From Swiss-Prot:
Biological function: Catalyzes a salvage reaction resulting in the formation of AMP, that is energically less costly than de novo synthesis.
BP term (GO), one: adenine salvage
Protein name from the UniProt record: Adenine phosphoribosyltransferase
InterPro entries, alphabetized: Ade_phspho_trans (IPR005764), Adenine_PRTase (IPR050120), PRibTrfase_dom (IPR000836), PRTase-like (IPR029057)
Molecular function GO terms recorded: adenine phosphoribosyltransferase activity
Cellular component terms (Gene Ontology): cytosol
Class of enzymatic activity (EC top level): transferase
Organism of provenance: Pseudomonas fluorescens (strain SBW25)
EC number(s) reported in the record: 2.4.2.7
Alphabetically ordered keywords of this record: Cytoplasm, Glycosyltransferase, Purine salvage, Transferase
């Protein structure tokens, strides 16, 4: 299968000054409105990971749920949800982290993983890496390891992928944007 980064990038809408002035938000909803683009994204990830050796897929709240759940279904893997604070009903582990917009907490059910499990983590975008780093810390606290962190978009100028790599976590993104790219 051939992956055309230009086609995907053309369906990621830049929203200027959202959620605050000076930010160009990368809106992926047009990707999900195009059955062809969604299939291309899902199939690209599935093809990359179909023979990979990991036990679970971890999806980040909220846009990471969209692609993570599709890939978990396609690859027949258990799906672990990493949620924003206060959204999970049972016993949780929590981890604080910094985002490009401020401070937040990420939670996961404490019984989601066991020692020896290996997690492929999904989010829509890697910016500062804060969410995925918090998730990686939670995974490690449960005795599991991180197979890779994957996203549709990388913003390399914000250094998130580099931070993850420095923690020993490989990353994979389908496309990337410069901060000023429209």
């Amino acid at each position: 299968m051939t992956f055309d980064s230009f086609d995907i990038k053309s369906l990621i809408r830049p929203v200027i000054d959202f959620p605050k002035p000076g930010v160009i938000f990368r809106d992926i909803t047009p990707l999900f409105q195009s059955p062809r683009a969604l299939r291309l994204v899902a199939d690209s990830f599935a093809q990359r990971y179909v023979e990979a050796d990991f036990t679970h897929i971890g999806a980040m709240d909220a846009r990471g749920f969209l692609i993570g759940s599709i890939i978990a279904y396609q690859l027949n893997k258990p799906l672990i949800l990493f949620r924003k604070q206060g959204k999970l009903p049972a016993d949780v582990l929590a981890e604080g982290y910094q985002t490009e917009y401020g401070e937040a907490f990420l939670e996961v059910h404490a019984d989601s993983l066991c020692e020896g499990d290996s997690v492929l983590m999904f989010d829509d975008l890697i910016a500062t890496g804060g969410t995925l780093i918090a998730a990686a810390n939670l995974v490690r606290r449960m005795g599991a390891k991180i197979f890779e962190a994957a996203a549709i978009i990388d913003l390399p100028e914000l250094g998130g992928s580099q931070r993850l790599e420095e923690m020993g976590i490989p990353t994979f993104c389908l496309t990337q944007f410069a901060l000023t790219e429209r």
